[in-house]
């Protein structure tokens, strides 16, 4: 497993994809419900990785602290699980949710943290983890991988709006994806046109529930009573770190770019865990 320290979490209260183009485009992109949900989840992951998990690791060195380590790990799992649920709620295509998001503003993240710390609410929140089977189905249409302006692989959403490029010294495949001979600069510029950004975010918002379900239903996080001590602390810590790693890659897909998470992005996409279509082999 890749050490958690190798994950490059953002250093700010409002993380933006490093490939997000101009500030105006980035702000418009950030206001979309789905991307906002991913950013809040990414902030939670950043805080969890930088503060809670290092404490767990240090305390876990002492053999007489197994009970305390297990409790802290379970609290971390509950917090991360509640963050996933919060992301699902924020991404729902509801006008009421959109208006609520505008009015609540920065208070939303604090409310999400309060829900995570309140053990009494976790039973109700956990019911959202088991989604109806149609929510797990991916769209039948996909657009193949393209390149960003820094020449790193990224996943193009199936709903991305094709842009009418010039025909000089360029090629395109059947799905309308720019060919490799095209200028990387032009690909980057047009990938962040407003209509393309909004279409990608809408498509990714539709896939959010499936992505979250893939993490949680695969038992990467311990689900159940926090007082249950059947799972050894070592195995519990491995599951939690795996969930954080998977969530980091999900955030990368959400931003439609591999935002510094390393080479495992390609491995996860190859396994079709979060892909919007068939795996690229």
From Swiss-Prot:
Matching InterPro entries: EHV_Unk
Sequence similarity: Belongs to the herpesviridae US10 family.
Protein name in UniProt: Virion protein US10 homolog
Subcellular location: Virion tegument; Host nucleus matrix
One Pfam assignment: Gene66
UniProt modification remark: Phosphorylated.
Gene coding for it: US10
Gene Ontology molecular function: zinc ion binding
Ranges of compositional bias, category Basic and acidic residues: 97-119
Region annotation Disordered: where it falls in the sequence: 90-119, 136-186
Cellular component terms per the entry's GO annotation: host cell nuclear matrix; viral tegument
Keywords: Host nucleus, Late protein, Virion, Virion tegument
Induction: Expressed late in the infection cycle.
């Amino acid at each position: 497993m890749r050490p958690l320290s190798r994950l490059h979490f953002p250093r700010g209260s409002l993380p933006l994809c490093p490939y997000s183009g101009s500030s105006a485009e980035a702000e418009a992109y950030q206001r979309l419900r789905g991307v906002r949900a991913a950013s809040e989840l990414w902030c939670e992951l950043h805080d969890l990785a930088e503060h809670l998990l290092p404490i767990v690791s240090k305390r876990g060195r002492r053999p007489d602290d197994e009970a305390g380590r297990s409790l802290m790990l379970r609290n971390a799992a509950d917090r991360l699980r509640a963050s996933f649920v919060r992301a699902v709620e924020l991404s729902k295509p509801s006008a009421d949710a959109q208006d609520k998001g505008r009015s609540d503003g920065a208070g939303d993240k604090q409310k999400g943290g309060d829900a995570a710390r309140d053990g009494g609410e976790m039973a109700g929140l956990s019911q959202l983890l088991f989604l109806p089977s149609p929510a797990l189905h991916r769209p039948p249409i996909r657009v193949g991988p393209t390149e960003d302006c820094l020449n790193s692989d990224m996943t193009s959403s199936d709903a991305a709006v094709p842009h009418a490029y010039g025909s000089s010294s360029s090629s395109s495949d059947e799905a309308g994806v720019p060919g490799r001979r095209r200028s990387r600069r032009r690909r980057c510029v047009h990938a962040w046109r407003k209509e393309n950004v909004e279409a990608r975010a809408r498509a990714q918002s539709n896939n959010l529930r499936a992505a979250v379900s893939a993490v949680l239903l695969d038992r990467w996080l311990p689900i159940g009573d926090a007082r249950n001590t059947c799972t050894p602390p070592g195995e519990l810590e491995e599951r939690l770190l795996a969930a954080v790693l998977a969530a980091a890659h999900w955030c990368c897909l959400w931003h439609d770019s591999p935002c510094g998470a390393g080479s495992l992005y390609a491995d996860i996409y190859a396994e079709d865990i979060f892909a919007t279509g068939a795996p690229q082999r």
